[in-house]
């Protein structure tokens, strides 16, 4: 079977349409036969047989390498034994044997092109088209992005790294041009239990640069040599596997490769490493001399987190929080009539914070953040408990906390989907809906409340930056002056003043700026004359929101900026700065 389209639906699951994966054609569900005719005629793929031969050669080469490397390993058929939880909470078992070669295709690039007014149906259902005896399959779970479980991709390539021109037969007369897979991918998951030619390319490219993994290599500590090695791997992955890495994303992917090797080594030592995982492990045998990289622990709490949950060992905070959360079924039980009421849910978070105060002093935002962390840990732990893939297993204490969380619904049960009372749009999570209501309908307050002051924010990251800047010690010191900062990006921007770097250049006039934001303001205001902020009291318009706010202060005669040298007052900071210069000149 070959995936050729997606089934799209609206938010109420009342209307369904078919959308072609390779173009913008859509059709009604009842016209599926005409849709298949369109795919066969407009998007004939003539290199299908070539791809199957490449995959067979790739599989044979995998077997030969492993047999030569470790004859003690017993190899059975490929076992894609990962348990994947789909959106309906159903376990999907992916299997393949030596007779039915399978490979996965990434739907990320195709799905991104769908119309915003439509969504994938439940479970991300897709239409399948018969394509001969051989089988291809798209792993829909590859679109889920979680730590060590990022997008899973595939590409037209073999382990022999031959180009398409070397393998493709002459074009058949009378056939339309073959379809091409649109767009590049920017990341993919490294897994030893899924067949993915991109992983093979990565292993081969990484093996050719021992300065990145062999401590005894003479260039192991040579940063220029390591940078050149990263660039070479990025170039090769772009050319051979259609993956456009950044340096940071490449480093994360290589870390995944090391983690998979470490977990496979532990499994081999227990005598349980078989099938596809054993063959990938054999291809990575060169990593035996590399420093051991272990899986990262679950997300760590920092100083900004008020409720510090720890599932690795028994503790009062985690136990009390789970017990308190269980007392508020309106936050997790979809069967209750008040489950969808954003006002009642917000009040429940406040009451939960008040009830939890004898253990930890926290506000409703701290409770909401802790609830989200609990749910993320819960569903990840369930996956690790049920799965046979190469990931870290649950500890005994985690299993005990899992039993305490048995009151929570299964993942994918629409338990966190909430609807806006004003426009019927749906959102995942209370705070996403509350931000929408404030911005789109101008009702209520922004959800993220600072733990130390009354300020509110629309994003978690903005609240954390505010806490660091306003309520924590500034530990980052400038190497050129005595100033210190609480946020790393603030220090980097400040350092540009000392170094004189202005990396952002206007393409129209050549003027340079330290910040991308300043460049955008320059282009929009000077060259495009975009002035989106207009005064309600006069006809003036402004480029920036704060300029409008200062202008309105002038209308209202609000002069809150006062000179420290005299009694002069002003309604904006720029006027005060000009006035200060007059004092300095005197």
From Swiss-Prot:
Chromatin-binding protein involved in the organization of active promoters and insulators. Essential for the activity of heterochromatin promoters; primarily binds to specific motifs within promoters of housekeeping genes. May also associate to a lesser extent with promoters in euchromatin. Mediates recruitment of Cp190, a multifunctional protein involved in the recruitment of transcription complexes, the creation of open chromatin regions and the activity of insulators. Gene3D superfamilies: Classic Zinc Finger. Possesses 2 MADF domains, the negatively charged MADF1 and the positively charged MADF2. Both MADF domains are essential for protein function. MADF2 is important for recruitment to heterochromatin and may mediate interaction with other proteins. Possesses a C-terminal cluster of 6 C2H2-type zinc fingers. This cluster of zinc fingers is essential for protein function and sufficient for recognition and binding of specific DNA motifs in chromatin. It comes from Drosophila melanogaster. GO terms for molecular function: chromatin insulator sequence binding; promoter-specific chromatin binding; sequence-specific DNA binding; zinc ion binding. The gene is cliff. Its main location: nucleus. The keyword Transcription does not apply. The keyword Nucleus applies. This is Madf and zinc finger protein 1. It is found in: Nucleus; Chromosome; Nucleus, Nucleoplasm. Keywords: Chromatin regulator, Chromosome, DNA-binding, Metal-binding, Nucleus, Repeat, Zinc, Zinc-finger. Interacts (via regions flanking MADF domain 1) with Cp190 (via regions between the BTB domain and first zinc finger domain); the interaction is probably direct and is essential for protein function. It comes from the Eukaryota. Transmembrane segments: none annotated. The overgrowth of red pigmented tissue in the eyes of mutant flies is reminiscent of 'Clifford the Big Red Dog', a character from an American children's book. SMART domains: MADF, ZnF_C2H2. Disruption phenotype: Larval lethal in 2nd to 3rd instar stage. RNAi-mediated knockdown in the eye results in adults with the rough eye phenotype and misaligned ommatidia.
